[in-house]
Amino acid sequence: GGREHALAWKIAQSPKVEKLYIAPGNAGTTAVGENVNIKATDFEAISAFALKEDIAMVVVGPEDPLVKGIYDYFQNRPELKHIAVIGPFAQGAELEGSKEFAKGFMMRHNIPTARYKSITSATIEEGLAFLETLEAPYVLKADGLCAGKGVLILPTLDEAKKELKEMLGGMFGSA
């Protein structure tokens, strides 16, 4: 996506970069490096390619491989440890990967954050009642990776209640 293109574009400008591979890449990244047809979550294929091409650094753009532990994968294998991976370990990536985890972390560490309540299909009535205790605008966030689209900001209570029901009905997939 756009983030990966921006990273590749900037990295390609470094005089220290001899060759730049982007996996899987997109139409925009072809102008700055070589796209490689490997899914960002196929750690075995990425590591095999990195070893074959003598790659010194892996910069991870999308959240999905971070949450699934690509950093940990490289760090836990002796043959890959010498390859620098730019990105957090899996537990650190959970701050982005799970809104519930992030809110819990902030609460445990006294980091200021807005009031929240985690809602499931089973607790929808609790969620609707919680919305009534808040003031507009109402912010609803899906828990999980939604490619940057899992947040709704709604001006009225009626809209917030309607959208909460739709979110729990699968609006953002499994998130």
Give the label of every model feature segment.
Residues L80-G150:
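A conserved helix-loop-beta module that forms one wall/lid of the active-site cleft
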Residues N35-D42, K117-T123, L152-L154:
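Short acidic-hydrophobic, aromatic-tinged amphipathic segments that line or gate anion-handling sites
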Residues G1-G2, A23-N26, G61-E63, P88-F89, ...:
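Fold-independent oxyanion-binding glycine-rich loops
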Residues G1-P88:
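ATP-binding N-terminal substructure of ATP-dependent carboxylate-amine bond-forming enzymes
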Residues P112-R115, T133-V139, P155-A175:
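Conserved ATP-binding module of the ATP-grasp superfamily
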Residues Y73-A84, F105, P155-K162:
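A glycine- and small-aliphatic-rich helix-loop capping segment at beta-alpha/alpha-beta transitions
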Residues F43-I46, V67-Y71, K99-K103, G127, ...:
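A general structural signal for well-ordered alpha-helical segments in protein cores
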